Amino acid sequence: MVAEWKDAGGPTGPPRWIAPLHLHRNDDEAWYVLEGALCVRVGNEVVEARAGTSVLVPRGTVHTYWNPGPGLVRYLLVMTSNIYSLIQDIHAMAERSPAALRAVFEKHESELADE
C-alpha cells in the first residue's frame, strides 16, 4: 500500500517524532520524499532524505522518523496492509497510554522500542 502524508514541521529543538521508536517483526517499510526533508532513524543510523530520495527500513529494525525543520515535508509511505491497519488502529484510539499503544503494536506483530 502507498499513502501520501505530510508534516508541517515545528519549532527548533529536539526531534518531534511522527511515530514512536518501534519495529515491525514481519514487515518492511519505506518512505519516498516528495518535498522537503525527512529524517529516518534506521537502527542506530539517522538518514536525512530529501525530495527525490527514499529510505527502506527492513523488518525487525528499530526505527522512527521526523521532519527535521520548520518547513513542510511531503512523503509517500510504502507499507504492507498490516502496517496500514496498525496506523488506522492508532488513529482510532481514544486513549494512547503506553500500555494501550503496546497492545495495539503487538496486535500487528510490531513492538515499541526503548530509547
Residue ranges and their predicted role:
Residues 4-6, 37-39, 76-78:
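Residue-level recognition of well-ordered beta-strand positions that form the cores
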Residues 26, 45, 61-62, 71, ...:
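A generic "binding-loop/recognition-motif" signal
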Residues 1-21, 27-28:
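A short glycine-rich, His/Asp/Glu-containing loop-to-beta-strand
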